[in-house]
Amino acid sequence: MSTAPNAKNNISLKKSVGDVFRLTAKRVLMRVDFNVPMQNGHITNDYRIRAAIPTIRRVIDQGGICILLSHLGRPRGVSMVAGVRDIRRRYHEAQFHDNKGKTAFFSVLPGEEKVKILAKSSAREEATHISPEVKSGKTMLFARLPEDEKKSLLMQYLNENKDSALPQMSVSAGYEEQYSLRPVAVRLAELLGQHVYFAHDCLDARVEVSRLKRGNVMLLENVRFYSEENGENAEEREAMAKILASYGDVYISDAFGAAHRDSATMTGIPKILGHGAAGYLMEKEISYFAKVLGNPPRPLVAIVGGAKVSEKIQLLDNMLQRIDYLLIGGAMAYTFLKAQGYSIGKSKCEESKLEFARSLLKKAEDRKVQIILPIDHVCHTEFKAVDSPLITEDQNIPEGHMALDIGPKTIEKYVQTIGKCKSAIWNGPMGVFEMVPYSKGTFAIAKAMGRGTQKRGLMSIIGGGESAGAAELCGKLSISHVSTGGGASLELLEGKTLPGVAVLDDKE
């Protein structure tokens, strides 16, 4: 089968961090995807953090200053206006009013901190003779300073030490603890082997950013604590992007997982700075998808699974123009089987998509694409794990039973088909792989792709999401590329252009 004439490649190669020179002393804004799974404040899978390390190292090894931006989860988010109002309120509460409280506040500070404050005062010469020890005259010297100077010195101290001295200032507007990136900063520091600075509010980090030195790394707090990040109003997104863009000189994106978002950090910042380059991870994602959507080694097989046909309509339609074989699994397979007249018991079926299934089967026949559906199933009467589930003789599923995985004969046929191909792309599990009795089909696909890659150079791509998670459960596999972007990879395979990729500079 040859690629259809209207099957256009919707992705082009982009300038990468390797093409960007002279990062020394440059403040590099790097959008990463640290949207990692968390449980009780602990990271359960740090793959996305580890995947960004090579680009971070490139920046700091060249003497650049690396400022990382990311989201985590789906916090409610507050508007910038409300956020700024909240910041001002908290600062106001921390101020000293009516010439009261300044000396009292100073008096309870540690001796070392008092000495540091006095060293910046008009009485610094006198202060050089004062010891940090208790009752050496530090508070008395501070008390003699003019009220305006006292206020100025203390506000400077609070700005520089708000974590310890002013805890009410050390959280972002819109802060929700379960979505904070602070645990990510800790893990990143462990992986890098160096301190990672953490800015508690991505839109109030100007002072912290200004203190960074060459080779430093800073992670800003969750950008989705502000609703403008993914807001529908373009002007509001731009306003947020302008603040963030003011922190940096260079923009690099390594966040393929968020590349389908037209957001303040994915598209707004590079538009304002007038440039954007891909990090090593983004470059790899673009390179592999450009190959599989452009001119891949033939034959090319697409393995598509998941729960709903409706979620994969555009993918199936688009990929049908590019592939030689299509293997369908997961619950979506039962809609196709019913469309062909087979019994599916009480398995999931999208009645409204039966006509689409028939149409796709006809298109495939016309284009000489071989669609292969399950020929046996692993079933049970309920959606739960059992020691000995029913394995059907053929495509038909008995009444009162639901299929929860592809059967052994189907596994054999699918593995044989992958073995005939030179390229394979997989999106979506073959069954309910989270339950051990129904995991064999999904794991067999992952292992077949790994073996093919290792033994005969199969170009294998796993399109993120559940497929990537399933592949990781199989242990170390020799897959050419496991995408970090579930939604982004799906949209690419649907033939869509990703805003977060399109905005980057094309490779010359």
Curated annotation (Swiss-Prot):
Pathway: Carbohydrate degradation; glycolysis; pyruvate from D-glyceraldehyde 3-phosphate: step 2/5. One of its GO terms (molecular function) is metal ion binding. GO terms for biological process: gluconeogenesis; glycolytic process. Mg(2+) binds at A307, E311, E466. (2R)-3-phosphoglycerate binds at V32, D33, F34, N35, R48, S70, H71, G73, R74, R224, H260, R261, K308. Keywords: ATP-binding, Glycolysis, Kinase, Magnesium, Metal-binding, Nucleotide-binding, Transferase. ADP binds at G306, A307, K312, G330, A403, N427, F433, E434, E466, S467. GO terms for cellular component: cytosol. It is an enzyme of class 2 (transferase). It catalyses: (2R)-3-phosphoglycerate + ATP = (2R)-3-phospho-glyceroyl phosphate + ADP. It comes from the Eukaryota. InterPro entries: Pgk_euglenozoa, Phosphoglycerate_kinase, Phosphoglycerate_kinase_CS, Phosphoglycerate_kinase_N, Phosphoglycerate_kinase_sf. PANTHER family: PHOSPHOGLYCERATE KINASE, PHOSPHOGLYCERATE KINASE 1, CHLOROPLASTIC-RELATED. This is Phosphoglycerate kinase A.
